[in-house]
Amino acid sequence: MDLFHALEKKLGKLNIIVEDLGFLTPSVLKLVKDSGFPGMKVVQFAFDSREGSDYLPHNYPTHCVVYTGTHDNDTILGWMNTAPKASVKFAKEYLNLTKEEGYNWGMMRGAWASVGDLAIVPMQDIIGVGSEGRMNTPSDLRRQLGVERQPQTRLTTNFAKRLLNTCKCTDV
């Protein structure tokens, strides 16, 4: 904590997000709490039975940053196609995901409507690409950065209006 106190004394308030994902020991949890920095909540993790219920949006604290997925996850649509059927079914029921709305739009709505102070959605999820748009696969040395390979034709005026309206409807 001394490092963070010294940095704040020199630089002022720090805008740091704690990557509190994976295996967390009691000492790590204490450090996160003592730091006062927001942690991460990943919506995709909510429906993976191995992750427990802390990732379900109704369990989020307000002082957190919500992500639909991270650079190490598949895109929403990729996840919908590869996750266990029970996980996908749970996600559809919990977030009221429909094909008509678009599964990516429904999961984004869930992130943006959560109580978290901030929600971040990767561009791959916004433009609605599948696994071909995945940014990174841990331990895979091939270059991925999938969004750069996506057609610009997805970014229409109607698309921009829909994104703006969705953001406005979930801004509290």
Residue ranges with predicted function:
Residues M1-V172:
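Catalytic cores of glycan-processing enzymes that make or break glycosidic bonds
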